[in-house]
């Protein structure tokens, strides 16, 4: 769910997920769509593609369990869809951390109508 995703992003990046990524670039946030503006935005694009591959669960609402061991996210679900959902969220959180160096505050509240059409996943 969005709750676990936000928690993972906070743990991995130390940033407030809603403030820092809720409307970042063309792909971060609920209304995200379009050609990525930078590496951080590309993380969100790949995350949306990961969600599109899921069947049998609702990425925004369904809760799953994970643990934070030695600064590492460990997904712990028996349900295959929820496990994949957790892995999608884990991947974007790690990607956002790995790209903190190129985070651009100018893209924090980027206007989505100015985004160019992106390739399909």
UniProtKB/Swiss-Prot annotation:
Gene3D superfamilies: Phospholipase A2 domain. Rosmarinic acid inhibits the myotoxic activity. Bromophenacyl bromide (BPB) inhibits the myotoxic activity through a covalent binding. Caffeic acid and aristolochic acid, two plant compounds used in folk medicine used to treat envenomation, inhibit the myotoxic activity. The keyword Disulfide bond applies. Keywords: Disulfide bond, Myotoxin, Neurotoxin, Secreted, Toxin. The record marks 112, 117 as: Cationic membrane-docking site (MDoS). The record marks 111, 114 as: Hydrophobic membrane-disruption site (MDiS). InterPro entries: PLipase_A2 (IPR001211), PLipase_A2_Asp_AS (IPR033112), PLipase_A2_dom (IPR016090), PLipase_A2_dom_sf (IPR036444), PLipase_A2_His_AS (IPR033113). PANTHER family: PHOSPHOLIPASE A2 FAMILY MEMBER, PHOSPHOLIPASE A2, MEMBRANE ASSOCIATED. Belongs to the phospholipase A2 family. Group II subfamily. K49 sub-subfamily. This is Basic phospholipase A2 homolog piratoxin-1. It comes from Bothrops pirajai.
């Amino acid at each position: 769910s969005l709750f676990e995703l936000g928690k993972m992003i906070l743990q991995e990046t130390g940033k407030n997920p809603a403030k820092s990524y809720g409307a970042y670039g063309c792909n971060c946030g609920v209304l995200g769509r379009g050609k990525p503006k930078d590496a951080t935005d590309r993380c969100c694009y790949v995350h949306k593609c990961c969600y599109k591959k899921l069947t049998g669960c609702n990425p925004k609402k369904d809760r799953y369990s994970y643990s934070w061991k030695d600064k590492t996210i460990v997904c712990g679900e028996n349900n295959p869809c929820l496990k994949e959902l957790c892995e999608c969220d884990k991947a974007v959180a790690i990607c956002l951390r790995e790209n903190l160096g190129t985070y651009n505050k100018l893209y924090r509240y980027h206007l989505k109508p100015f985004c160019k059409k992106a390739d399909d996943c």
